[in-house]
Amino acid sequence: MKKASRSVGSVPKVPGVNKTQTTEKTKPESGSSLSAVTKLSKPGTSASLLKTKSNDDLLAGMASGGGVTMTNGVKAKKSTCASTVSSTTGTTMSTLENKPRTVAGSTARRSTSSGTKESSSSRERIRDRSRLSQSKKLPLAGQGSNDTVLAKRSRSRTNPESDIRMSKSKSDNQISDKAALEAKVNDLLTLAKTKDVEILHLRNELRDMRAQLGLNEDQVEGDEKSEEKEAIVVHQPTDVESTLLQLQEQNTAIREELNQLKNENRMLKDRLNALGFSLEQRLDNSEKLFGYQSLSPEITAGNHSDGGGTLTSSVEGSAPGSMEDLLSQDEHTLMDNQHSNSMDNLDSECSEVYQPLTSSDDALDAPSSSESEGVPSIERSRKGSSGNASEVSVACLTERIHQMEENQHSTAEELQATLQELADLQQITQELNSENERLGEEKVILMESLCQQSDKLEHFSRQIEYFRSLLDEHHISYVIDEDMKSGRYMELEQRYMDLAENARFEREQLLGVQQHLSNTLKMAEQDNKEAQEMIGALKERNHHMERIIESEQKSKTAIASTLEEYKATVASDQIEMNRLKAQLEHEKQKVAELYSIHNSGDKSDIQDLLESVRLDKEKAETLASSLQEELAHTRNDANRLQDAIAKVEDEYRVFQEEAKKQIEDLNVTLEKLRAELDEKETERSDMKETIFELEDEVEQHRAVKLHDNLIISDLENTVKKLQDQKHDMEREIKNLHRRLREESAEWRQFQADLQTAVVIANDIKSEAQEEIGDLKRRLHEAQEKNEKLTKELEEIKSRKQEEERGRVYNYMNAVERDLAALRQGMGLSRRSSTSSEPTPTVKTLIKSFDSASQVPSPAAATIPRTPLSPSPMKTPPAAAVSPMQRHSISGPISASKPLATLTDKRPSYAEIPVQEHLLRTSSTSRPASLPRVPAMESAKSISVSRRSSEEIKRDISAPDGASPASLMAMGTTSPQLSLSSSPTASVTPTTRSRIREERKDPLSALAREYGGSKRNALLKWCQKKTEGYQNIDITNFSSSWNDGLAFCAVLHTYLPAHIPYQELNSQDKRRNFTLAFQAAESVGIKSTLDINEMVRTERPDWQNVMLYVTAIYKYFET
């Protein structure tokens, strides 16, 4: 009997073993004694164990809904608890031994812990036989509970700190979860208090009944144990029902949280995949993070029951370097810390509530502090190390997240810029294609007209041959125009061949383009058909998925109905237990009556009655044991069904998520296909519109062709008229030849006179230049002498002002006389130079020659620049010069003006070469101002002028029989030559189009230089410009420009006087932006950015920043 009652009563004490596993792992030597003490503790401790059972079951249900890693930890805990219970209960709880132990035996750590637990359970069986040893070991239970309370309190102190640090990233979710957990804890505390009140009430009633019966103390203790076990058995079904309801509610809530976390996980995965980041690059960081979180194996082993081992199990079971591990690690560290905090708070509060309800014997039998002194210190040190590790991991995670955000923003900016450039390029290609088609149509029309013209030409050639034959028959002499036959005719024929070849080549190209377009149209139609087929298949698959979901829902309802049936059976078993309890009470009353009869009356009848009662009692006990076994079976079945329901729900949820994901993917593909179909339809409509436009153009070209035919007929009539005029002109040409011979003699005489005039002019020019050089040299010497004399005068004045006034006055008079003599000499030389000029006839000849060979332009009549005046191209622009530099530059310029005016106030003939007089053309072929030759190079210009005059003499004297029209044609052909030799004439059409494109879009040349897109090319240019500048790292056009230093650095390379870059810092943003924008506005770059907005935002609009930087590049580089 006692054995059976022991087996029945040992079932609900499983949570006690589960509760004390943390202390068993920290102190394995005292683990067996603690488990033995918790088995045979007082009713108060049993009640507290019952409450901890309900709490642990509740937390295990919460952890089972928290994800795969939490369920692994809970299954391992259940398997270890089942092994310890099966070793203590024996054959009655053999069903618990049949639970799967694969999770517990997967790792060596769990196998060793199960072995120690089996050895401790064997020790417990040996210690069960002696009460004395059990009563001695009783104080260890109080110490174990105190140790667990201390460990949990220290855990609850460290974990909220880590929670506070982790809650900075996910504050909203954690606040809601914390509020829900606090509400659950409050409910559990109220439930525990009500049950404690009921237990105290029942204990008082039991003691009153025992006092009324007057039983012995041994029997009281045995009855206490039996009644305690029965009370636990009675209260268990109600606890099972309440915990089932609570677990269901919590399971649904935690499933919702799990779905939210999975959605967030999926979103983060998609973002990482979109950004192109792989976890292999961050494998070292992830391994360090895992190492930090599993620094000491004792901490993970001690926190295994609280969910601390989930991270290590997930790390051991997952492949290193996968994307899912990184995201699940971050989320599970947050969730595990949160759950462990809630569990520790709940355990600590429950232990504080249950401490006043324990008996005074436990408080008196508490062990000394030397036995349990090391455990809290070890726990605190380990918690401190884990807190530091969590801080390091949080810092690593925040830094990694910041880097990922920066990379994401720069890649998003680059993608947007690339998309804009692609849209621009697509528009340009469309325009070019339309222009190409228009040119092709025009070339087709030109080819048709060319073919018609060639036919007409053949017809006219046949007519000409016919007319020639007629002329030969009638013996009429005719003159063939050599010019018509040779140059112009060959050129037209060559152009005709080139046009025909180009037309044939472009016709082949257009045919290829047409074939390509037809192929693309066919492919688009085929893709459309495939898309429609895929849409139908996806719809069918969607219907199939819906049918599968309906079947799963039906199976779920069936499982729920079976669960309700099992609940009904449990309720019936509970009613039966209540009936048996009442019967047992009735039997106890009978036993009490029998004892009273035994004390008063006959003993033989009482012996018979006792035997009968003993038999009835044995039958009742066997019946109770069988009912207990049936109840255990039903509980196992209920647990098995609940696990099956959880698995089915997990599978259903996974299946539903996969179905939703597939449906979303199918919807995305459907939208893509619809968009492609719309694009194809728009292209088709555009092609139809282009066809209609081409037909209209064909009609217009036909009308133009008719008009051209009319014009050709008119031109034929004019050709006939021109032929008549040609004969008249030939007669006039003969007369002109005769006149030309007469005038050629006069022209030769004029050339001889002109040669003499040129020689005289060159001599005059050389003499004048020599005299000007002598005058300049003498003036320079006089100025030097004057400077020396003034210096000597100042020195003499400083030394002897009062003594040497008269001497200085005489000396100055002498100097003035010398200067007057010099001035008189200069005047004589000028008069002599003017008197040595040629006669007015020579001047008139030179002027008439200049007027005949040049068309004067107002731009060329400007005052020439003196040799000492600075070149206009050498002066720096106003943009790159500060105001002080402008003053310093304008000083020597103004000082050099009087010197220039002294030397020469009019242009001299020596500074203009003779070939420029002879070959000077109109203003279109010459720049506005001609460069003048300095006086230092007068000898070179004289030699060049003489050489050129000799060449002109040879050229003029060579063609004796030439007509004056050839010389007159020199002025007309020279502009063509100058145009062909000009730099703009040598530019090909492709370079002209490129220059036009660069003027329109300045970034195109930059993109060709650096390669890639325009945005990346401009970014590389900015990086190249800001090399060597501190505190600047340009990686994008948003966050790299938010402090203004990048603008200041770029503008400092061009305008160093406007921006004091060494005095700037990144903190004073407004000053940086103000300096940069003012410097840009000073050279004419308008500010398109708002200073207040740039100062306020950390990430300004990258498009506005890029436009402003483009304006800077366009101003300074193009």
Swiss-Prot record:
Residues 29-52 have a biased composition (Polar residues). Keywords: Cell cycle, Cell division, Cell junction, Coiled coil, Cytoplasm, Cytoskeleton, Gap junction. Residues 1-176, 299-324, 359-391, 856-879, 921-1002 are annotated as: Disordered. It comes from the Eukaryota. One of its GO terms (cellular component) is gap junction. Its main location: cytoplasm. Residues 79-119, 359-373, 937-946, 972-991 have a biased composition (Low complexity). It is found in: Cytoplasm, Cytoskeleton; Cytoplasm, Cytoskeleton, Spindle; Cell junction, Gap junction. CDD domains: CH_CYTS (cd21199). Residues 1012-1117 form the Calponin-homology (CH) domain. Pfam families: CH. Residues 193-281, 396-450, 488-808 form a coiled coil. SMART domains: CH (SM00033). Residues 120-131, 158-171, 947-957 have a biased composition (Basic and acidic residues). One of its GO terms (biological process) is actin cytoskeleton organization. Involved in cytokinesis and spindle organization. May play a role in actin cytoskeleton organization and microtubule stabilization and hence required for proper cell adhesion and migration. PANTHER family: CALPONIN HOMOLOGY DOMAIN-CONTAINING PROTEIN DDB_G0272472-RELATED, CYTOSPIN-A. Belongs to the cytospin-A family. May interact with both microtubules and actin cytoskeleton. This is Cytospin-A. It comes from Gallus gallus (Chicken).
